[in-house]
Amino acid sequence: MGIQHLNKYIRNKITLYNNNNNNNKEEGSAIKTITFSELNGKKIVIDTSIYMYRFSSERCLIDSMYQMISLFKMNGIIPIFIFDGPSPVEKKELIKQRREEKQISETKYKELHYKLKDVNDYEERKEINNELDSLKKKFVRLKREDINNVKNLLTLYGVTYYEADGEADKLCAKMVTEKHAYACLSEDMDLFVYGCDKVLRYISLLNSTFVLYDLNKILECLDISFTHFKEICVISGTDYTCHYNDSLSCNSINPNNSINPNNSINPNNSINPNNSINPNNSINPN
């Protein structure tokens, strides 16, 4: 699930916090850019489908996955890839909505592509091609063959992967909160709701960098408890509340509670790595 406005809200608050405390240095910040080499020797879990969709939209799925794995290994990072299992019933409405949006984008793409044949003006052709590229990314579909090819690549490369019973993000968060991994690589902000205290976003294979979000430092900057933070996330709207139109505006949030470091991370059940986790198989995060 995604949380509307959360990233902008957090970034605005942290900028304000840093300005008020005359802290212009990124070092020690709640959000900072780090290099791959800074995670040498650390395990990270990866919400795999996010990057499969991204690389598929760029028509370089296997090449980019291979490059990602190679760069991780080169920098001493131990990756654990998590694949989605069946989607929860609660997300049925959203999945239907996304399927319809993909069909609309695909139809528009075909219409524009047909129109392009009769356009001779260079600037107009350039504009249409840019729109075609944008539309193409909106109706990317992963086939079972794509998933199997990526799993085969991971197996050949000796990389561990799991398939969750449900969505991958919950299992990713669980593995971080229970210290089976240092951080989770994902673009979904909802990992914070599950108590995942370190999230890596905006991966750049070209520059070998991530942007690290540190939940405990974020809570300190916001001056709120983890419980209050979760309430803000839920009110803001998630994939499970897509039928509601009232999402929380970034400017309307005025958290005044103080942080309680004892309840900032509250994982639920424990994972026994010797019994309940079977590499390259399915796993129940509960």
Report residues per predicted region.
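Periodic short-repeat tracts
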Residues: P255, I259-P279, I283-P285
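Non-catalytic, usually N-terminal nucleic-acid engagement modules in DNA/RNA processing proteins
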Residues: M1-E111
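Extended two-metal-dependent nuclease catalytic cores across DNA- and RNA-processing enzymes
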Residues: T15, N20, K96-N256, I283-N286
